[in-house]
Every structure is written in C-alpha cells, then in structure tokens.
Swiss-Prot record:
EC annotation from Swiss-Prot or TrEMBL: 1.14.99.1
Feature type site, description Aspirin-acetylated serine: S516
Name of the protein described by the UniProt record: Prostaglandin G/H synthase 2
Residues modified to S-nitrosocysteine: C526
GO BP term, example: response to oxidative stress
Length: 604
C-alpha cells in the first residue's frame, strides 16, 4: 500500500514538473523540443552550431564569428568617415555590393515562411497558413513554467502602470538628437498602420491586415467592399472633393465607408480614407490627403500614356506604382534618416535576383510591439503660429482645412520629434497606450528582452546598468524585475541606452531592421516577374518609382512645393541631451490619457 502511495505521489509530482524548455536552453536559434516530462532535445540543424544546447560553433562558424565585428562597431564605421563613404557612394559596384550585403544579412534573420504564432509554439500548418495571426520571431513562453518569463525573475510581473509611471512617462520633453521631425513621426504612423492592424475583438495576437506588408490598404481599404466605396470608377481614380481649389478626401456621407469619429465631429469634417482610424489626428489625414492626390495624379499620367486603358487597369497599375514609390521613399529617405549612415542606402530589387530570397512576408507581433514609438510625439503641435494640445488636435480635421496642407508640411518639417530610447519620454496623453503594449505582450507570452537579443545574434545584457547606461533607472528596473534575464521586451526597448547622438538603442535597430527590410524587399513588386517596366505601364510608370522621394511626393501634390525632409532643417533645434532622462515632471498631467484609446485604435 505504501509503495502504491509513493508511486502515486511520484506520478503527481512528475505531472507538475515544469516544461524542460522553460529555461530556453537552446542557443543560437536552436529549437527546443521536450522529450518526456523532464527532458529536452535541441535541434541544431543548419544553425552552424552543435552540442547539447547548440552552443559549440562549427569550424566555419568559428571563423565567421572571429571576423565579424560587433553591431556597434559596424554602426560606428557607417556613421563616421564621411569622406570615405562619399567615395563608396559614387562607385556603383561597391555601393551595390554593400547594399546587397545589408539586405541579405538582415533579411536572413527573419524566418520565411513563418514558424510560430501566439497559440502554436511549435511548427504547425496552422501557424503557417492562418493569415489572421501575427507570426512570432520567438515562440511563446510555455504555459507551465515557474515564472512568467520561463524560470528567471519573480513569480509575478510588476504592475504595468507602475512600469510606465516610473520608467517610461515623460518628465520633460527630450528631443531626438538625430533631428527627426513631425513629418517623420506622422509618416511612420501613417505607413505602418497598413500592416499593424490588431484585431482587438479577437485579441492582440490577431490582425486585420491580411496582406502582411506594403499593400497600401490604408489608402485603398482592406477589403474589396471598402475599396469600391472609395473608388470613383472613372479613369482609375479615387473619390475626392475640392475645397478652396485643392483636393481632399471625400466624406463618410459621400462614400458610406465606415470611419471612427466621435459623435460631435460634423459631417463635412468626417473624411473617408482607406484606414478607418486615420481621422484620429490631422497629421495622419495630411498624409492620407497627399497620397490620395498622388494616386489621382499617377492616373492622369497613365491615362495620357495609355488612352486605350480602362478604369480598372489604370487603378490597378497606379496602385502598383504607389507601392513602389512607398518602398523607395521608406528605404532611401525614411530608413536612411533613421540609420544616420553616411553610406547611401539604395532601393534596387535587382540586387537580390541572384540571391536566395523569398518574396513573401508575415508581420510579427514583436515587430508591432517594437514599433510603438510614442516618445516621438511632442507636448504640443505647432502649426504655423498656433500651438495645439492633444485635446485640441485629435479628431479635428478643421485644423487641416484652416491651415492647409502647405502650412502643415512646412510646420511639421520644422518641429522636432522626441527621442525614443533612453526612457522617460512617453507623453502622458498616450500613457494608457504604453501600458496596453506591456499588458498585450504578457497576454501573448513574449520571452524576455535578453532572449530576443540572443535570437537576433546580440550579446545579452549582464546587468541593469549595462542596459540603461545610468544608475537611477537601472535601480528602478532591478527593484521591479529582480533579474536582468526577466526584463520584458517593450519596457527594455524604451529604457535601453541610446547609441551616441541617436534616437534608438542597439536592440531597436538590430531587431527592427531585419523585419523592416524583409517586409519591404519581400513585396511581390520586387520579384523578378514583377520588377520590369511593363508592370507599371512602361518606362513612364517605372520612372515615377525610380525617382520617388519624400520631396518629390510633396512637390507633386502640395501647393508651392514646400521644402521637406525627415529631419529638422535648423541644426540649432537639435540639442545635445544626456543619456539618462530628467526626473522632473512635465505639465501635461491634466490631459485625459484615455482620449486616444479607442477599441480599434490602441496602436495609435
């Protein structure tokens, strides 16, 4: 009888044993598989490593690791020695070779086809085929682990609001030392919300952006039904209205396309565009208006070139051209600015034609979380000679009509944005959005910040002070989390020490860049079958793509061709800032923090 009791106790104890993969034992992208209840096996296939935990490098891997400089060394080289890079930029074969390496080395860090999602921490047909999920760079932490992050850290995670209050919330506006402006901030917001479209009815692991990339559904609508409501069905154009001699989006009443507006917004200010949340702030509607004008302008160009084409072909070809323009602007203007490189990035799909590369993409949940760059937002928005606080700015398209697109472009080009890394720079107006980012990451069972660093071949941080580069926030972090290997992804990205004179820390760049470049170059228009003049209506359409820039987009569609770029033109606006954030509070506590939080727009 005693023997039976002991056996029963042993079985019960075994059934409550933690999943052996909770400790994330497999290194260097090795895959952990449980064997029985208390054993695991690491699959090191094609990792370049071997051993029980995939920790021993093969001979060629050892040589590569010895020769490979650290990411910070590469960043230093690319952001210094301007004279050398000026020479390289003017030697086509050298520039092409370096750009090709940048694209392949970054893109190969992304699994394609996708591997995991929030409900499947192992390879499955469901994880591959179900487009309604965001994919995952790392599988979720197993359900039966001793702690929320696996085996490290406390048994209960710190209160998300406490994290935001102590580490993320702005005390005083910290400008971006790279000089990013509000044209950049709103471009980032407008561009990314064609593929960051969380389905909040189903949960943060699900997306409504089934195109999983640059398909411009934020211009044309996610569904065919919405697209048809927005189209004019004449000469390929989108519906529009003329106000004071300039083109603006049509109204909800004229299109019957659903948009999110509060009841108090009058009908004539309820503009209808592809993304239903873009009525939130005039900065988003500014870009929506500019791209509407660009689509209809391209239709006119194609109509002149191809009078024989009907409405459908003009529409579809114009959409492909705008996709090409978008990718070109993102790589050569937007990413170029973010990088701070003296090396000139180049959009040229032919660089990958002789490489092993898959022309498909799946948006990762971690990429969505990483892109919550709310510290970019200022305390107030300066348009011409007027300042608007958040309560005056949101859902107020009358500002757009009052000032006009030209004044918006001029003003946002001059207004500096905030620094993202370094901590304590999230505006109080979006405090609840930052808190939701932490809560949703927990719901999706993200692995720790250091596990993501290892996944992207970065050395894990060994101390809190190494992470933040200062003492005050590192002490707060340690009190909250207890273990550097238990710090969560989103808070760590925002408190990580910035690179010298940079907007981001190392991890934001080294994790974000692979997702970004794979998503851009994995677009179907970049494939050999598509990347040819005939796809875009001939040389005229191809030329529109190959000469696109943020300045040309503005000049072609905004009265007076105001100067613009993604950085402030006046160097005096860029002030030297310290790595650690100020501990004094800003004066924006009276703003209702829930004002930007609507059920379907928390990513904004």
């Amino acid at each position: 009888m005693l023997a039976r009791a002991l056996l029963l106790c042993a079985v019960l104890a075994l059934s409550h044993t933690a999943n052996p993969c909770c400790s994330h034992p497999c290194q260097n992208r090795g895959v952990c598989m449980s064997v029985g209840f208390d054993q695991y096996k690491c699959d090191c296939t094609r990792t370049g490593f071997y051993g029980e935990n995939c920790s021993t490098p093969e001979f060629l891997t050892r040589i590569k690791l010895f020769l490979k400089p650290t990411p910070n060394t590469v960043h230093y080289i690319l952001t210094h020695f301007k004279g050398f890079w000026n020479v390289v930029n003017n030697i086509p074969f050298l520039r092409n070779a370096i750009m090709s390496y940048v694209l392949t080395s970054r893109s190969h860090l992304i699994d394609s086809p996708p591997t995991y999602n929030a409900d499947y921490g192992y390879k499955s047909w469901e994880a591959f085929s179900n487009l309604s999920y965001y994919t995952r760079a790392l599988p979720p932490v197993p359900d039966d682990c001793p702690t929320p992050l696996g085996v490290k850290g406390k048994k209960q995670l710190p209160d998300s609001n406490e994290i935001v209050e102590k580490l993320l919330l702005r005390r005083k506006f910290i400008p971006d030392p790279q000089g990013s402006n509000m044209m950049f901030a709103f471009f980032a917001q407008h561009f990314t919300h064609q593929f960051f479209k969380t389905d909040h009815k189903r949960g943060p692991a699900f997306t409504n952006g089934l195109g999983h990339g640059v398909d411009l559904n934020h211009i044309y609508g996610e569904t065919l039904a919405r697209q048809r409501k927005l189209r004019l069905f004449k000469d390929g154009k989108m519906k529009y209205q003329i106000i004071d001699g300039e083109m603006y989006p049509p109204t909800v009443k004229d299109t019957q396309a659903e948009m999110i507006y509060p009841p108090q917004v009058p009908e004539h200010l309820r503009f209808a565009v592809g993304q239903e949340v873009f009525g939130l702030v005039p900065g988003l509607m500014m870009y929506a208006t500019i791209w509407l004008r660009e689509h209809n302008r391209v239709c006119d160009v194609l109509k002149q070139e191809h009078p024989e084409w009907g409405d459908e072909q003009l529409f579809q070809t114009s959409r492909l051209i705008l996709i090409g323009e978008t990718i070109k602007i993102v790589i050569e203007d937007y990413v170029q600015h973010l990088s701070g490189y003296h090396f000139k990035l180049k959009f040229d799909p032919e660089l990958l034609f002789n490489k092993q590369f898959q022309y498909q993409n799946r948006i990762a949940a971690e990429f969505n979380t990483l892109y919550h760059w709310h510290p970019l937002l200022p305390d107030t928005f300066q348009i011409h000679d007027q300042k608007y606080n958040y309560q005056q700015f949101i859902y107020n398209n009358s500002i757009l009509l009052e000032h006009g697109i030209t004044q918006f472009v001029e003003s946002f080009t001059r207004q500096i944005a905030g620094r993202v890394a370094g901590g304590r720079n999230v505006p109080p107006a979006v405090q609840k959005v930052s808190q939701a980012s932490i809560d949703q990451s927990r719901q999706m069972k993200y692995q720790s910040f250091n596990e993501y660093r290892k996944r992207f071949m970065l050395k894990p941080y060994e101390s809190f002070e190494e992470l933040t580069g200062e003492k005050e926030m590192s002490a707060e972090l340690e009190a909250l989390y207890g273990d550097i290997d238990a710090v969560e992804l989103y808070p760590a990205l925002l408190v990580e020490k910035p690179r010298p004179d940079a907007i981001f820390g190392e991890t934001m760049v080294e994790v974000g860049a692979p997702f970004s470049l794979k998503g851009l170059m994995g677009n179907v228009i970049c494939s050999p079958a598509y990347w040819k003049p005939s796809t875009f209506g001939g040389e005229v359409g191809f030329q529109i793509i190959n000469t696109a820039s943020i300045q040309s987009l503005i000049c072609n569609n905004v009265k007076g061709c105001p100067f613009t770029s993604f950085s402030v033109p006046d160097p005096e606006l860029i002030k030297t800032v310290t790595i650690n954030a100020s501990s004094s509070r800003s004066g924006l506590d009276d703003i209702n923090p829930t004002v930007l939080l609507k059920e379907r727009s928390t990513e904004l």
